[in-house]
Amino acid sequence: MKAMHYTLEQLNQASADAFVAALSGIFEHSPWVAEAAALQRPFANIDTLHHTMSKAVETAGEAKQLALINAHPELAGKAAVRGELTAESTREQSGAGLNQCTQEEFDRLQALNRAYREKFGFPFILAVRGYDRHGIIANFEARLNNSRADEMRASLDQIYRIARFRLDELIDA
């Protein structure tokens, strides 16, 4: 099924409910981000919309930020195996070849997912566009050496990158 596309003008003029529904997939399972942005319309460009949505997350407090981080699936994780990813996550993970892992790569990703979640208490997040499986695994391994505070920051920054990619796919410039 082809994803809907909108113009910024359509989103600016939409009801708050329609705006939130259109942007509900931008920040994984977190419509509250779109709800906050709806109050700031109109937007002159996608950059401003993205900044406003990201700022809503930045100012939300750690509990909401952690909930947003935890709303993201593990890379090549259980949700992917069970076919429970959102359409956006499925496209992104497939685009990086995570649906074509060898058994060895899959086992390595599963071990990294467990180690990362055990150390930090949330899933590893990476905007996978532009990465192949080997690059994802290398990034995963390197980030396991970070502090929890550094990984919270890295996770949010990656979420903002994912959101920008999703906005660019959804909105016709």
Describe the residue ranges of each PLM region:
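Short, Lys/Arg-enriched N-terminal segments with co-localized hydrophobic residues
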Residues: 1-3
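Aromatic-anchored, charged helix-turn/loop surface patch used as a conserved interaction hotspot
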Residues: 5-13, 25-27, 33-112, 161-173
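Surface-exposed, charge/polar-rich loops and edge strands
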Residues: 19
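C-terminal non-catalytic interaction appendages of large macromolecular assemblies
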Residues: 101-173
